Amino acid sequence: MPCRGLHSIPAGPVEFPEIATVYVMCGEKLTVMIDAGVSNSIADFSFLDKLDYIVLTHLHIDHIGLLPELLQVYKAKVLVKSGFKKYLTSEDGLKKLNESAEKVLGDLYYVYGGLEKKLDQDKVIEVEGNEEFDLGGYRMRLIYTPGHARHHMSVLVDDFLFTGDSAGAYFNGVVIPTTPPVIDYKMYMESLKRQIELKPKVVGFAHGGLVSPKIMEEHLKQMLSKEEIQINVDIGGVAGEILRKQIEVNLRGLRESKKSI
């Protein structure tokens, strides 16, 4: 039976699958995946009868890890911000991508896993971040949202906004800045405000799942606060330790970015 509608799939590491979410929108014409999880994931995509595009919100390893596996199964094209295809399709680019991730994430790099092999040139298409696609029953628009990364894009499908890491994360009722080193604080804030102005009905976080758009507004207030942000989320066990380490990375990046303002 053909896939239809929106699907939300946990695609984090086996110790904490819910830390990363991949979204699939199945239209009558096209099926699109938003991000590709971590390489150490056991995410199940077997319900998909086809896959036309994989939109990468950005190239951090927790969003691209399953690309080689997915492209072995499906004849999909990968959409990435213009100027950054080389990091997926060359040995030198792949090395830089993984080394940068290890430097920022520390032990978490080995929990998530890196991108294990480069992709074929013809599998990756560069986009500017303002393209539109008719999925058949749904209209998809790419939106350039730099700040978290220079190559960050969000995806608007009708009234559903998929923000990647450009508008925060959300676990156990707590909003978490998605601000690891090296972010551009000013651009991050501009992208966050611009997405709030879109007035989506539902927001899909890459870390935290589907949430109310009010969470983005809460995150904006959090980021504008004069006080240093403190995050306390205790979910226990190995998953709790992974989340704690990721929060530490994000808050470190936020502190460093504010020094340059």
UniProtKB/Swiss-Prot annotation:
Annotated Zn(2+) 2 binding lies at D62, H63, D165, H207
**Would you say which domain of life the source belongs to?**
Archaea
Task: Could you list this entry's UniProt keywords, alphabetically sorted.
Answer: Metal-binding, Zinc
What positions does the entry give for Zn(2+) 1 binding?
Answer: H58, H60, H148, D165
Please give the Gene Ontology molecular function terms for this protein.
Answer: zinc ion binding
**Family assignment from sequence similarity:** Belongs to the metallo-beta-lactamase superfamily.
Q: How does it assemble?
A: Monomer.
Question: What name is this protein filed under?
Answer: Metallo-beta-lactamase fold-containing protein ST1585
Q: Which organism is it from?
A: Sulfurisphaera tokodaii (strain DSM 16993 / JCM 10545 / NBRC 100140 / 7) (Sulfolobus tokodaii)
